Amino acid sequence: MATVLIVGKSNVGKSTLFNKLIGKKKSIVDNKEGVTRDAVSDRVSYFGKSFKLIDTCGIFERPEDIISERLKNLTLNMLSEGDIIIFVVDGKYGLTSEDYHLADLLRKSNSDVILVVNKSENEKKVFVNFDDFYSLGFGEPLFISAEQGKNIDRLIEEVIKRLEKKGLKLEEEEEKDSIIRVALIGRPNAGKSTLFNGILERERALVTPIPGTTRDAIDELVEINGKKYLFIDTAGLRRKSKVEYKSIDMYSNVRSIKSIELSDVVVFVIDSLEGITHQDQKIAGIAENRGKATVVVFNKIDLVKNFKYRKQEFIEHFMERLYFVSYSPVVFVSAQERYGIGKLIKAIKEAYNSLFYRVQTSAVNAVIQRMIMFSPPPRGLKIYYGAQVDVKPPTFLFFTNGKKVPEFYQNNIRKIIRENIYHFTGAPIFLKFKNRH
């Protein structure tokens, strides 16, 4: 698919432009400098033609810390991916040394660049600096206002014109049901971004030893063995007590939860060195409550001493701490060494298939009647018959005499379905009860 990158220094409005072009709020927008830490991507569709758009991190001329340095390198490495570069500068405050520095890098990369002057609400004021913008060497600039939507259509038309001139195919919208959407979730620094990069076989997400370096939910469409997967690397979910109201971390938490809601399968990444914490239990609960298939991944096994002899220990730890998602397949990986990636993909596909599996009504009732015979329901409760009524997640409806079905007996029903009808590996089973009368 044709790919377009948005680049520029921090705080020139790249994320606002990205959100305007894709037609929804996906990149985090804030007036603090350097808010975007990850390259966020989505599809832009315009009159039946579409291309991939990537919002890159702001580039600093002289990075002040390890994160800024890695951000700069990450963005520079991505320049070769872009068929077109949208170079955004600030029309309100004019050019700075950072703009000239980035322009020099873009010229050296031989990229096809569209110079966009954002924040051009006041045309007369912006036009005073026209010669400065033109001197960057990218031809006549396009003056826009991402905030107000000014000249956005002209920008898209220019992008499409250049892409078509290159002979690139502008794909139609993919059939959504043909793609398995996978969210990588877990606590900060559990290794989600390293795993994300390992699956893609290249660096796409920012990876540093500092917890919480992923702020946006970033995604990538890949094809593995003929099947398309959309992998989403979410920001690590933090405890509410550690997140300030209206802070960037709060927006990241909301975005991560939204990514879970939009996914089919949630890959729950656990740091093997730290084990499963109370916060991990809460994160897994979010996925289960939303009816998502789950795969549990113990990461960093290359750092665990004598792991070969301790695998059962980790499985028992999982069963004890995450008993409510015990139906999930467990995969041991080293994201750093790319060990276990193949097994993970296989587990994801199996969990996805479980979401859509349907069982015969006759099988459900035969098993339930046997259960009632050998393990009768609590006094006063009668269960007459049932059937599977939905998928994604698998949902069963049982007709009763109206008495409440205790949670322990609901768990027994789920267990008997998994053991005697179909395992539904990775998928939660939802139960509904209705008074027959």
Swiss-Prot record:
The UniProt entry's GO biological process terms, in alphabetical order, are: ribosome biogenesis
Q: Which PROSITE patterns match?
A: G_ENGA
The domain of life for this entry's organism is Bacteria
Query: Which regions form coiled coils?
Result: none
Q: Which Gene3D superfamilies match?
A: 3.30.300.20, P-loop containing nucleotide triphosphate hydrolases
Q: Which residues bind GTP 2?
A: 186-193, 233-237, 299-302
Alphabetized Pfam families for the sequence = KH_dom-like, MMR_HSR1
The answer to whether UniProt assigns keyword Metal-binding to this entry is no
Keywords, alphabetical: GTP-binding, Nucleotide-binding, Repeat, Ribosome biogenesis
Q: Where is the KH-like domain?
A: 357-437
Keyword Repeat in record:
yes
Q: Which InterPro entries match?
A: G_ENGA, GTP-bd, GTPase_Der, KH_dom-like, KH_dom-like_a/b, P-loop_NTPase, Small_GTP-bd
Binding positions (GTP 1): 8-15, 55-59, 118-121
Q: Where is the EngA-type G domain?
A: 2-167, 180-356
Q: Which GO terms describe its molecular function?
A: GTP binding; ribosome binding
* UniProt cross-references to NCBIfam families, sorted A to Z: GTPase_EngA, small_GTP
Q: Which family does it belong to?
A: Belongs to the TRAFAC class TrmE-Era-EngA-EngB-Septin-like GTPase superfamily. EngA (Der) GTPase family.
Quaternary organization = Associates with the 50S ribosomal subunit.
What job does this protein perform? GTPase that plays an essential role in the late steps of ribosome biogenesis.
Which PANTHER family does the entry mention?
GTPASE DER
Protein name as annotated: GTPase Der
Which source organism?
Thermosipho melanesiensis (strain DSM 12029 / CIP 104789 / BI429)
